[in-house]
């Protein structure tokens, strides 16, 4: 009997080895993205088809413990283990070994600098990629100089990385342009926003990916990723704002006149609501998260506190217990929107798990002094960039 089991084990091992050899390696047309959030990790795999991504697999796993705070990785070991679990489940679904990943960075110390740069061209020169690269590099250089000078003046010795930039506007012979390539002119200019994050935020993200055998193919910022997913370019002529309310951070971006005009981040987000429930009802973090998720139901919520006593709380009482914290969250988000937009936008999109919180949309509408028909949950425009026959993508949690 033992010999039969041994032979069977060897046969299974050979089959597993054969399956491993047969697994494809991720091709250039396959995109693997990980959203490493404060409460969960969501992974997506898609194939680029005619300028859109066909999403073929999605996996999600929640953190069992608080391994991330305010969008920043605190426990690399735990986050990498969870990310590896998501990656392996996706690999099994798409029968492909995933080697490259796209990620979006968040953090408690996002800082931006706006800069412009211009070039005089000989004659009416054809503008190619090399000229556009020189133009953008010049503006980035000016942004870095201004950023370094400010840090020096404030005796801030922390190391920062330039992690991305967004072009606000191009100019050709004093006229605004959305794209300079293949035009001819004598004078070109670019206006852009450069973004910086502390080195520990970026390095922890790279270390986490390296631990599970992934190369970071691209890194962007969560506010940029959110607005690119939720608001297509043809809508950016309007003055719109997007808030992606996660567990640890609320990522904010604004656009008008066809381009992104600013983005920022607030460290007040869904976890503050969870912590308010913990303190009010003496429950652990996991129980508080479950209670928060059930606020939308009208029936009383039943749970057991840390002392072992069962409690039954009506929805109205629960909403009252988080009212102060919810108001603080809305005021913080509203202040950040007004700061980067110069006023209330014409319309506001809400994304992320926090956008589902009962009453938050209505309270934010009042705080900004907007009409309730001008505030909506994002998701209707995801089809501009991605589609799926297997999954329902119009979920605000899939924004980044």
Predicted regions and their residues:
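Conserved phosphate-binding/catalytic loops in two-lobed NTP-binding clefts
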Residues: 129, 365-400
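Short beta-alpha connecting loops at secondary-structure transitions
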Residues: 261-262, 275, 317, 386-396
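Small-residue helix-packing motif on alpha-helices
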Residues: 288-291
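A general structural motif
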Residues: 325-334
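Glycine-rich phosphate-binding loop of actin/hexokinase-like ATP-binding domains
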Residues: 192, 238-276
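Catalytic P-loop NTP-binding/switch module of NTPases
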Residues: 273, 278-285
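Nucleotide/phosphate-binding catalytic cleft detector across ATP-hydrolyzing
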Residues: 1-40, 44-240, 261, 270, ...
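Glycine-rich phosphate-binding loops at beta-strand->alpha-helix junctions
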Residues: 344-369, 379
């Amino acid at each position: 009997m033992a010999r039969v089991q041994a032979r069977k084990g060897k046969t299974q091992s050979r089959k597993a080895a054969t399956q491993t050899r047969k697994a494809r390696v991720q091709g250039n047309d396959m995109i693997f993205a990980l959203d490493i959030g404060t409460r969960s990790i969501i992974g997506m795999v898609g194939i680029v088809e005619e300028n859109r991504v066909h999403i073929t697999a999605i996996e999600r796993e929640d953190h069992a413990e608080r391994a991330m705070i305010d969008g920043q990785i605190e426990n690399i070991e735990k986050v990498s283990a969870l990310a590896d679990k998501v990656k392996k489940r996706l690999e099994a679904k798409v029968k492909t070994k995933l080697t490259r990943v796209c990620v979006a960075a968040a953090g408690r110390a996002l800082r931006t600098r706006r800069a412009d740069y211009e070039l005089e061209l000989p004659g009416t020169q054809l503008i190619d990629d090399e000229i556009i690269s020189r133009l953008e590099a010049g503006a980035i250089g000016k942004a870095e100089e201004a950023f370094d000078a400010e840090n020096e003046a404030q005796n801030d010795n922390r190391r920062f990385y330039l992690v991305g930039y967004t072009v606000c506007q191009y100019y050709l012979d004093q006229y605004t342009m959305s794209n300079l390539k293949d035009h001819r002119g004598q004078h070109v200019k670019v206006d852009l926003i450069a973004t910086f994050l502390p080195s520990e935020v970026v390095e922890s993200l790279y270390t986490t990916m390296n631990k599970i055998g992934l190369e970071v193919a691209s890194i962007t910022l969560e506010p940029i990723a959110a607005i690119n997913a939720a608001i297509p370019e043809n809508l950016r002529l309007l003055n719109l704002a997007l808030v992606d309310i996660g567990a640890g951070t609320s990522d904010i971006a604004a656009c008008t006149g066809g381009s992104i005009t600013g983005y920022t981040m607030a460290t007040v987000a869904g976890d503050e609501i969870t912590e308010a429930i913990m303190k009010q009802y003496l429950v652990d973090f996991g129980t508080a998260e479950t209670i928060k998720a059930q606020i939308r139901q009208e029936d009383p919520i039943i749970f057991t506190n840390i002392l072992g006593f069962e409690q039954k709380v009506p929805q109205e009482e629960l909403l009252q217990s988080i009212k102060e914290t919810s108001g603080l969250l809305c005021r913080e988000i509203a202040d950040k929107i007004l700061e980067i937009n110069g006023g209330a936008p014409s319309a506001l999109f809400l994304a992320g798990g926090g956008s589902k919180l009962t009453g938050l949309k209505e309270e934010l509408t009042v705080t900004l002094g907007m009409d309730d028909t001008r505030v909506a949950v994002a998701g209707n425009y995801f089809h501009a960039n991605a589609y799926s026959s297997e999954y329902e993508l119009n979920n605000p949690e899939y924004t980044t």
